[in-house]
Regions:
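Transmembrane catalytic cores of multi-pass membrane glycosyltransferases
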Residues: 21-37, 48-50, 57-61, 65-66, ...
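Short hydrophobic/aromatic helix or loop-helix immediately within or flanking a transmembrane segment
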Residues: 39-46, 57-82
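Short periplasmic/luminal acceptor-recognition loop of GT-C membrane glycosyltransferases, typified by
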Residues: 350, 360-444, 449-465
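Hydrophobic/aromatic-rich transmembrane helices and adjacent perimembrane loops
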Residues: 298-324
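Membrane-interface transmembrane helices that cradle and orient dolichyl/undecaprenyl
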Residues: 143-158
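Signature aromatic-anchored transmembrane alpha helix within multi-pass, membrane-resident enzymes
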Residues: 317, 321-345, 350
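Short acidic/glycine- and proline-prone juxtamembrane loop motifs at membrane-interface regions
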Residues: 128-136
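Transmembrane-helix motifs of polytopic, lipid-linked glycan transferases
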Residues: 88-108
Length: 495
């Protein structure tokens, strides 16, 4: 038994090592929103001492259920380089859901099957840079595993830890708190079905756990925020159960999705595995909420996608096989290896774009303002069809939209697309830069930029500069061009 335990722990360490290995390949991984979040953490770490950044931004702390990165990264940036801290937070976003999945599965009697979670570790939400969400889901799974282990044997310990952990989850990301509620709610529902007389006692325990987060939400900046909910067509919603596995090769992604969903399904049919009652109830609740949830609400997008990702982790957290056919085990191991090799290759190639971008940003001085423009996917579809695979996921989601944030991080220059929603980020843009940001709105394509009012900016930074010829020379003067990127001085700011 001791030898088996040692082998299991070594395998877990090996899995974690393989999963974080890509972070040693490139210093700015191609995660869509990540450069934007890193820039905000860099600003928070630099204020109030950096007088240049203080012209652009000011801290704006309030009760916000989306603060994991903002609380973790700035203190670390006082002792470690910014890109090291950034990759540490990505490592946390990768490993916490993996460790939480393993912990949950072992709490319900599983062991080796949970290691298959490596197939969903690099899911669509992680690759789109939703780090706070990913961290919070990992913490939710870890807390839920403790709840399952201790709820009956040591109820005070289980409830006490949950009461402390729930506000922490609220601070990390609200969706993590919702995930935790559904996981332990599923466990309690299972017990109530078995012992109906315990419904009041268990209901009061859940109320005590979520009382503090409910009070925090009622006074948070998110609570009064309005906005109509947006829903995807039902077919598109269901398709998200596959697209959560999206990486860089569609055929491989579909094979991974088929294996991750197919093995537990076949295990149930042929009775070589089971989904214990607490996990089954939790997965049922997650499925119901996924079907009912909007795609967008209160300024947050991909809401239902996040529940699909939670279900993806539960495929490995909630299934306990008596045995897994060797062909399935070998097949999943090969899929994992292929997925990780492809990811490492893609991330290594991404360094080409980073080198181009840094080369053209060299003339930018601290305190200057940089207008960023990109090649729209509809503006030049042929370019995107032939585009290098590191700039978009297999489902077409582009990943380079926020690379302009490097102008802020590495050149201490202003860029107009910093996330600063009061309900989601503890930072605000100062005037006159707030007015500049409002004037630009979204990241423009070249058709928009050619006639845009760019008064107030010093430069135009072009991403995908190899997609188009130079813009009008009477307005924009080329200073530097290097493959993916180009920098232009502004000679006539009004079109």
């Amino acid at each position: 038994m001791l030898r088996t335990d040692r082998t299991w722990w070594l395998a877990l360490v090996g899995l974690c090592a393989v999963l974080v290995a890509p972070l040693f390949v490139v210093d700015v991984p191609p995660l869509l929103d990540y450069p934007n979040h890193l820039a905000r953490a860099f600003v928070l770490a630099s204020l109030p001492d950096d007088t240049i950044l203080a012209r652009f931004y000011a801290p704006h702390w309030s009760i916000i259920p989306n603060l994991a990165l903002d609380l973790l990264a700035p203190p670390l940036m006082h002792v470690l380089p910014v890109h090291v801290v950034g990759r540490l937070t990505i490592a946390a976003a990768i490993l916490l859901p993996v460790l939480g999945t393993v912990a949950y599965n072992t709490a319900i009697g599983g062991r080796w099957w949970s290691f298959g979670v490596g197939l969903v570790a690099y899911n669509t939400c992680l690759l789109q840079g939703f780090l706070n969400f990913s961290i919070s889901v990992g913490v939710a799974l870890l807390l839920a595993s403790c709840w399952l282990r201790w709820r009956e044997a040591r109820p005070r310990r289980a409830i006490g830890l949950a009461i402390v952990g729930a506000p922490v989850l609220f601070a990390c990301h609200l969706m993590g708190l919702v995930c935790f509620g559904l996981l332990i709610g599923g466990g309690e529902l299972c017990r109530v079905v078995q012992t109906p007389s315990s419904i009041v006692r268990r209901g009061l325990a859940l109320l005590s756990v979520f009382a503090a987060p409910a009070a925090l939400y009622s006074i948070s900046a998110l609570q009064p925020l309005g906005g109509d909910a947006e829903f995807l067509p039902f077919g598109d919603k269901l398709f998200q159960l596959v697209t959560i596995f999206s990486n860089y090769d569609w055929a491989l992604d579909v094979a991974v999705a088929a294996a991750a969903m197919g093995v537990p399904a076949l295990g149930q049919v042929f009775r070589w595995g089971r989904v214990p009652c607490p996990a089954a109830c939790a997965m049922g609740l997650l499925a119901i909420v996924f079907l009912a949830a909007p795609y967008a609400w209160k300024g947050t997008y991909l809401l239902d996608t996040r529940f699909a990702v939670m279900l993806g982790f539960m495929l490995f957290a909630g299934f306990v096989p008596n045995r897994v056919p060797p062909i399935a085990s070998v097949g999943m191991a090969l899929l994992f290896a292929a997925r990780m090799v492809l990811l490492v290759v893609v991330w290594a190639d991404h360094r080409i774009d980073l080198t181009d971008l840094r080369r053209v940003l060299a003339p930018v001085q601290p305190g200057q303002a940089v207008y960023v423009v990109e090649a729209g996917q509809q503006e030049n579809p042929a370019y995107w069809t032939a585009n290098p695979h590191w700039r978009a996921l297999s489902d077409g989601t582009r990943l380079d939209e926020h690379l302009g944030a490097l102008a802020l991080i590495e050149r201490r220059a202003y860029w107009p697309f910093q996330f600063d929603m009061p309900s989601q980020q503890p930072i605000q843009t100062r005037e006159p830069y707030r007015k500049l940001s409002g004037k630009v709105g979204h990241v423009p394509d070249w058709a928009e930029a050619a006639v845009a009012d760019v008064c107030g900016f010093d430069y135009v930074l072009s991403l995908e500069a190899d997609a188009f010829p130079d813009p009008p020379a009477r307005r924009f003067r080329l200073l530097a061009r290097s493959g993916f990127a180009a920098l232009y001085a502004i000679d006539a700011c009004a079109g």
